[in-house]
Amino acid sequence: MNLKYGVIFSLVAALLLGGCFIVESLSARALNIYVAISFLGCGLAYAVKAPRFWQKRENGTISLTSLLLFAPLHALNWLSLLLAIRLQKERPLHEIEPNLWLGRRLIHGEAAGFSQNSEVAVLDLTAEFAENSNLRNTHYLCIPILDHTAPRQEQLKLAVEFIQSHILNRRVFVHCALGHGRSATVVAAWLLAQNKTQPVDIVIKQIKAIRPGIGLNSDQLAALNKFVENR
């Protein structure tokens, strides 16, 4: 899966660079090269499994260097998220178990409303989005994972431990970009850790019954199956 997206982003970069030989305007060529660098960098990030490409800090912010150098991709990420919110008409988050919430990256009003009346622990699995300022509290943990990829086993273990350490005392919100893949994988891992006899497919169905939009790819399912073997 990583290689697939690496190839796609690299091909887009190659097409943009090829366009430099077609357009005559120097400004258009410069723009093509600028956007191509963004896509090529993202392609390499997927090829070598490097979420640090986005330069997301532990406190949930993204460096100014990343925002400037990869502005076309940041803009594309936000456009994709806002378009998905508008078209899918899905609730931003769902309570899977008491105090355990699974959802997408919240926009400002949603985040303020969710965190307003009670203490919240936030597990942020996005590498490509800065966390909303309302959710970057003292109980915040960022485990940056590239979109459409699976958490490593040590990341799953860390995520499960974070959820377990907070769930008895406060609401825990686990999210990725859309709340369908990376975050669903982590929530499933926590559920599997609580019931060591439950099979992966049953846990996925349990989550899907509450948040129908989830969908784990083959890499994410493989990570869960390996997690079950090691638990």
Where are these regions (language model features)?
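Generic detector of intrinsically disordered, low-complexity, polar/charged segments
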Residues: L3, L15-L16, S38-L40, L100, ...
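Cysteine-based protein phosphatase catalytic domain of the PTP/DSP
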Residues: W78-V172, W190-V228
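N-terminal membrane-anchoring alpha-helices
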Residues: M1-I85
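A phosphate-binding catalytic loop at a beta-strand-loop-alpha-helix junction
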Residues: R170-A188
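Glycine-centered secondary-structure boundary/capping sites
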Residues: A36, S118, L178-H180, N195
